[in-house]
Amino acid sequence: DRFYQITELAITPDKQLPLGLRRHSLQERFASSFWSAKKSITNRREHLINSLEGFKENKITKEFFENSDENDDEDTIIAGLTKSELVSVDWENVIKNCESEIRALNTYVDLAEIVINSTTEGIDPDPKINETVRLFSEHIDKNPGKPLLIFSKYTDTLNEVERAVISYCETNDIYMGYASYRGDYRRIKYANDREHRKAEKRDITRALNNGRIQVIFCSSAASEGLNLQAASYMINVDVPWVPSDLEQRIGRIARLGQKEDEVVIDNIWYPFSIESNMYK
Protein backbone atom coordinates (compact mmCIF):
# COMPACT_ATOMS: atom_id res chain seq x y z
CA ASP A 1 0.00 0.00 0.00
CA ARG A 2 2.86 2.39 0.69
CA PHE A 3 3.94 2.41 -2.96
CA TYR A 4 0.72 1.43 -4.71
CA GLN A 5 0.13 3.79 -7.69
CA ILE A 6 1.98 6.67 -6.03
CA THR A 7 2.95 7.77 -9.55
CA GLU A 8 -0.66 8.46 -10.54
CA LEU A 9 -1.25 10.20 -7.22
CA ALA A 10 1.72 12.50 -7.88
CA ILE A 11 0.37 13.42 -11.31
CA THR A 12 -3.17 14.15 -10.10
CA PRO A 13 -2.91 14.99 -6.37
CA ASP A 14 -6.25 16.81 -6.42
CA LYS A 15 -8.19 14.16 -8.31
CA GLN A 16 -10.01 11.20 -6.85
CA LEU A 17 -8.63 8.09 -8.55
CA PRO A 18 -10.43 4.71 -8.50
CA LEU A 19 -7.65 3.14 -6.43
CA GLY A 20 -10.04 0.91 -4.50
CA LEU A 21 -11.29 -0.73 -7.68
CA ARG A 22 -7.77 -1.13 -9.06
CA ARG A 23 -6.52 -2.56 -5.77
CA HIS A 24 -9.43 -5.03 -5.78
CA SER A 25 -8.42 -6.20 -9.26
CA LEU A 26 -4.78 -6.58 -8.24
CA GLN A 27 -5.70 -8.52 -5.09
CA GLU A 28 -7.86 -10.87 -7.13
CA ARG A 29 -4.96 -11.59 -9.49
CA PHE A 30 -2.65 -12.23 -6.51
CA ALA A 31 -5.21 -14.65 -5.05
CA SER A 32 -5.36 -16.58 -8.33
CA SER A 33 -1.80 -17.95 -8.40
CA PHE A 34 1.88 -17.09 -8.00
CA TRP A 35 2.08 -16.89 -11.79
CA SER A 36 -0.73 -14.38 -12.10
CA ALA A 37 0.76 -12.30 -9.27
CA LYS A 38 4.18 -12.23 -10.92
CA LYS A 39 2.70 -11.22 -14.26
CA SER A 40 0.79 -8.37 -12.62
CA ILE A 41 3.77 -6.80 -10.89
CA THR A 42 6.01 -7.37 -13.93
CA ASN A 43 3.50 -5.63 -16.20
CA ARG A 44 3.17 -2.73 -13.78
CA ARG A 45 6.95 -2.32 -13.59
CA GLU A 46 7.31 -2.34 -17.38
CA HIS A 47 4.48 0.17 -17.66
CA LEU A 48 6.29 2.56 -15.32
CA ILE A 49 9.71 2.05 -16.92
CA ASN A 50 8.23 2.82 -20.35
CA SER A 51 6.57 5.97 -18.98
CA LEU A 52 9.56 7.29 -17.02
CA GLU A 53 11.43 8.72 -20.02
CA GLY A 54 8.34 10.67 -20.98
CA PHE A 55 8.04 12.06 -17.46
CA LYS A 56 11.62 13.32 -17.71
CA GLU A 57 10.55 15.34 -20.76
CA ASN A 58 7.40 16.55 -18.97
CA LYS A 59 5.29 14.30 -21.17
CA ILE A 60 2.65 11.73 -20.43
CA THR A 61 0.99 9.37 -22.88
CA LYS A 62 -2.74 8.99 -23.10
CA GLU A 63 -2.38 5.28 -22.36
CA PHE A 64 -0.77 5.89 -18.96
CA PHE A 65 -4.11 6.12 -17.18
CA GLU A 66 -6.10 2.94 -17.63
CA ASN A 67 -9.36 4.88 -17.43
CA SER A 68 -8.56 7.43 -20.14
CA ASP A 69 -11.14 7.60 -22.91
CA GLU A 70 -9.71 6.91 -26.36
CA ASN A 71 -12.42 9.10 -27.87
CA ASP A 72 -11.38 12.22 -25.96
CA ASP A 73 -10.22 15.18 -28.02
CA GLU A 74 -6.45 15.31 -27.52
CA ASP A 75 -6.52 19.10 -27.83
CA THR A 76 -8.69 19.20 -24.73
CA ILE A 77 -7.60 16.24 -22.65
CA ILE A 78 -4.30 14.38 -22.41
CA ALA A 79 -4.38 11.22 -20.28
CA GLY A 80 -7.38 12.53 -18.37
CA LEU A 81 -5.75 15.93 -17.74
CA THR A 82 -6.71 19.26 -19.24
CA LYS A 83 -3.84 21.32 -20.62
CA SER A 84 -4.01 23.70 -17.66
CA GLU A 85 -3.73 20.75 -15.25
CA LEU A 86 -0.82 19.34 -17.24
CA VAL A 87 1.10 22.60 -16.87
CA SER A 88 0.75 22.46 -13.08
CA VAL A 89 2.12 18.91 -12.72
CA ASP A 90 5.11 18.68 -10.37
CA TRP A 91 7.25 16.58 -12.70
CA GLU A 92 10.13 16.31 -10.24
CA ASN A 93 7.80 14.69 -7.73
CA VAL A 94 6.26 12.45 -10.41
CA ILE A 95 9.72 11.19 -11.42
CA LYS A 96 10.69 10.64 -7.78
CA ASN A 97 7.52 8.65 -7.07
CA CYS A 98 7.80 6.67 -10.29
CA GLU A 99 11.39 5.66 -9.51
CA SER A 100 10.38 4.71 -5.94
CA GLU A 101 7.56 2.53 -7.21
CA ILE A 102 9.87 0.86 -9.75
CA ARG A 103 12.41 0.06 -7.00
CA ALA A 104 9.68 -1.44 -4.83
CA LEU A 105 8.38 -3.51 -7.74
CA ASN A 106 11.91 -4.72 -8.52
CA THR A 107 12.03 -6.20 -5.02
CA TYR A 108 8.69 -7.97 -5.48
CA VAL A 109 9.60 -9.27 -8.94
CA ASP A 110 12.89 -10.66 -7.57
CA LEU A 111 11.01 -12.32 -4.70
CA ALA A 112 8.49 -13.82 -7.13
CA GLU A 113 11.35 -15.20 -9.24
CA ILE A 114 12.91 -16.83 -6.17
CA VAL A 115 9.61 -18.46 -5.18
CA ILE A 116 8.73 -19.65 -8.69
CA ASN A 117 12.23 -21.02 -9.33
CA SER A 118 12.31 -22.90 -6.02
CA THR A 119 10.51 -25.92 -7.49
CA THR A 120 11.79 -29.46 -7.25
CA GLU A 121 11.17 -32.01 -10.00
CA GLY A 122 7.50 -32.90 -10.27
CA ILE A 123 6.40 -30.36 -7.66
CA ASP A 124 5.14 -26.91 -8.59
CA PRO A 125 6.13 -24.04 -6.27
CA ASP A 126 2.48 -22.97 -6.15
CA PRO A 127 0.35 -25.12 -3.80
CA LYS A 128 -2.75 -24.30 -5.84
CA ILE A 129 -1.24 -25.88 -8.93
CA ASN A 130 -0.20 -28.97 -6.95
CA GLU A 131 -3.69 -29.31 -5.50
CA THR A 132 -5.21 -29.03 -8.97
CA VAL A 133 -2.99 -31.86 -10.24
CA ARG A 134 -3.86 -33.97 -7.19
CA LEU A 135 -7.60 -33.48 -7.70
CA PHE A 136 -7.24 -34.22 -11.41
CA SER A 137 -5.33 -37.43 -10.68
CA GLU A 138 -7.86 -38.51 -8.08
CA HIS A 139 -10.77 -37.89 -10.44
CA ILE A 140 -9.39 -39.84 -13.41
CA ASP A 141 -8.44 -42.74 -11.10
CA LYS A 142 -11.91 -42.96 -9.53
CA ASN A 143 -13.92 -41.96 -12.60
CA PRO A 144 -12.11 -43.20 -15.72
CA GLY A 145 -13.54 -41.80 -18.91
CA LYS A 146 -15.62 -39.13 -17.17
CA PRO A 147 -14.62 -35.64 -18.38
CA LEU A 148 -13.91 -32.61 -16.23
CA LEU A 149 -13.50 -28.84 -16.51
CA ILE A 150 -10.67 -26.81 -14.96
CA PHE A 151 -11.45 -23.11 -14.59
CA SER A 152 -9.37 -20.02 -13.88
CA LYS A 153 -10.20 -16.39 -14.50
CA TYR A 154 -6.63 -15.55 -15.52
CA THR A 155 -4.66 -16.80 -18.51
CA ASP A 156 -1.36 -16.74 -16.60
CA THR A 157 -2.78 -19.15 -14.02
CA LEU A 158 -4.45 -21.35 -16.61
CA ASN A 159 -1.27 -21.65 -18.68
CA GLU A 160 0.64 -23.02 -15.68
CA VAL A 161 -2.22 -25.33 -14.68
CA GLU A 162 -2.37 -26.77 -18.19
CA ARG A 163 1.41 -27.23 -18.28
CA ALA A 164 1.40 -29.02 -14.92
CA VAL A 165 -1.54 -31.32 -15.72
CA ILE A 166 -0.20 -32.29 -19.16
CA SER A 167 3.25 -32.88 -17.66
CA TYR A 168 1.67 -35.18 -15.05
CA CYS A 169 -0.12 -37.12 -17.80
CA GLU A 170 3.05 -37.51 -19.87
CA THR A 171 5.09 -38.62 -16.85
CA ASN A 172 2.49 -41.24 -15.94
CA ASP A 173 1.76 -42.45 -19.49
CA ILE A 174 -1.79 -41.12 -19.41
CA TYR A 175 -3.12 -40.48 -22.90
CA MET A 176 -6.22 -38.35 -23.24
CA GLY A 177 -7.56 -35.60 -25.43
CA TYR A 178 -7.98 -32.10 -24.06
CA ALA A 179 -8.97 -28.60 -25.12
CA SER A 180 -8.06 -25.04 -24.14
CA TYR A 181 -10.71 -22.34 -24.20
CA ARG A 182 -9.43 -18.82 -23.46
CA GLY A 183 -11.52 -16.28 -25.31
CA ASP A 184 -10.14 -16.06 -28.84
CA TYR A 185 -7.55 -18.77 -28.07
CA ARG A 186 -9.29 -22.09 -28.69
CA ARG A 187 -7.23 -25.21 -29.24
CA ILE A 188 -7.93 -28.91 -29.17
CA LYS A 189 -5.63 -31.92 -29.02
CA TYR A 190 -6.96 -35.43 -29.43
CA ALA A 191 -5.19 -38.35 -27.78
CA ASN A 192 -3.56 -39.44 -31.06
CA ASP A 193 -2.55 -35.93 -32.17
CA ARG A 194 1.02 -34.66 -32.08
CA GLU A 195 0.07 -30.99 -32.10
CA HIS A 196 -2.80 -28.77 -31.06
CA ARG A 197 -5.22 -27.66 -33.72
CA LYS A 198 -7.43 -24.58 -33.83
CA ALA A 199 -11.01 -25.23 -32.80
CA GLU A 200 -14.36 -23.51 -32.78
CA LYS A 201 -16.74 -23.55 -29.86
CA ARG A 202 -18.84 -26.28 -31.49
CA ASP A 203 -15.74 -28.46 -32.07
CA ILE A 204 -14.91 -28.42 -28.36
CA THR A 205 -18.49 -29.16 -27.31
CA ARG A 206 -18.79 -32.00 -29.84
CA ALA A 207 -15.46 -33.55 -28.81
CA LEU A 208 -16.49 -33.45 -25.15
CA ASN A 209 -19.86 -35.03 -25.92
CA ASN A 210 -18.41 -37.89 -27.98
CA GLY A 211 -15.57 -38.62 -25.55
CA ARG A 212 -12.67 -37.54 -27.75
CA ILE A 213 -11.48 -35.12 -25.06
CA GLN A 214 -11.61 -35.64 -21.30
CA VAL A 215 -10.60 -32.25 -19.91
CA ILE A 216 -11.11 -28.62 -20.90
CA PHE A 217 -8.95 -25.83 -19.50
CA CYS A 218 -11.38 -22.91 -19.30
CA SER A 219 -11.00 -19.20 -18.73
CA SER A 220 -13.93 -16.96 -17.82
CA ALA A 221 -14.79 -16.82 -21.53
CA ALA A 222 -16.11 -20.38 -21.22
CA SER A 223 -18.47 -19.34 -18.42
CA GLU A 224 -20.97 -18.09 -20.98
CA GLY A 225 -22.48 -19.64 -24.07
CA LEU A 226 -20.99 -23.13 -23.75
CA ASN A 227 -23.01 -26.23 -22.94
CA LEU A 228 -20.56 -28.58 -21.27
CA GLN A 229 -22.92 -30.84 -19.33
CA ALA A 230 -21.12 -33.93 -20.65
CA ALA A 231 -18.75 -33.16 -17.75
CA SER A 232 -19.95 -33.56 -14.19
CA TYR A 233 -16.81 -32.46 -12.33
CA MET A 234 -15.30 -28.99 -12.11
CA ILE A 235 -12.14 -27.64 -10.48
CA ASN A 236 -12.04 -23.90 -9.81
CA VAL A 237 -8.37 -22.95 -9.43
CA ASP A 238 -9.54 -19.51 -8.38
CA VAL A 239 -12.98 -18.61 -7.13
CA PRO A 240 -14.79 -15.62 -8.66
CA TRP A 241 -15.24 -12.80 -6.19
CA VAL A 242 -18.64 -12.03 -7.68
CA PRO A 243 -21.06 -14.83 -6.70
CA SER A 244 -23.01 -14.53 -9.96
CA ASP A 245 -19.79 -15.28 -11.88
CA LEU A 246 -19.37 -18.48 -9.88
CA GLU A 247 -22.98 -19.41 -10.66
CA GLN A 248 -22.25 -18.92 -14.36
CA ARG A 249 -19.32 -21.32 -14.16
CA ILE A 250 -21.36 -23.93 -12.34
CA GLY A 251 -24.10 -23.47 -14.92
CA ARG A 252 -21.82 -24.97 -17.59
CA ILE A 253 -22.41 -28.42 -16.10
CA ALA A 254 -25.35 -28.10 -13.67
CA ARG A 255 -27.96 -27.67 -16.39
CA LEU A 256 -30.65 -29.46 -18.36
CA GLY A 257 -29.12 -32.43 -20.13
CA GLN A 258 -26.77 -33.41 -17.30
CA LYS A 259 -26.94 -37.21 -17.09
CA GLU A 260 -25.23 -37.69 -13.74
CA ASP A 261 -27.23 -37.67 -10.50
CA GLU A 262 -24.87 -35.11 -9.04
CA VAL A 263 -22.15 -32.72 -10.13
CA VAL A 264 -19.02 -32.22 -8.05
CA ILE A 265 -17.22 -28.88 -7.77
CA ASP A 266 -13.93 -28.35 -5.95
CA ASN A 267 -12.87 -24.77 -5.19
CA ILE A 268 -9.22 -24.09 -4.38
CA TRP A 269 -7.96 -21.13 -2.36
CA TYR A 270 -4.95 -20.21 -0.27
CA PRO A 271 -5.40 -20.53 3.51
CA PHE A 272 -6.11 -17.22 5.26
CA SER A 273 -6.64 -15.47 1.90
CA ILE A 274 -9.47 -13.11 0.96
CA GLU A 275 -11.03 -15.95 -1.05
CA SER A 276 -11.05 -18.28 1.95
CA ASN A 277 -12.74 -15.63 4.10
CA MET A 278 -15.32 -14.88 1.41
CA TYR A 279 -16.45 -18.47 0.90
CA LYS A 280 -16.22 -19.90 4.40
Q: How would you name each of these model-derived features?
A:
Residues 1-175, 180-184, 209, 222-224, ...:
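Helicase motor interdomain insertion/brace
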Residues 174-186, 239, 248, 262-272:
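Conserved beta-strand -> loop -> alpha-helix junction used to position metal-binding or nucleic-acid-contacting
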Residues 175-219:
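Conserved helicase ATPase core of P-loop NTP-dependent helicases/translocases
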Residues 197, 202-203, 236, 243-246, ...:
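Amphipathic, heptad-repeat alpha-helical coiled-coil/stalk segments that mediate oligomerization
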Residues 205, 216-231, 250-258:
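SF2 helicase motor core recognition
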Residues 212, 244-250, 254-280:
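A conserved SF2-helicase RecA2
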Residues 224-239, 263-267:
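A short beta-strand element within the Helicase C-terminal
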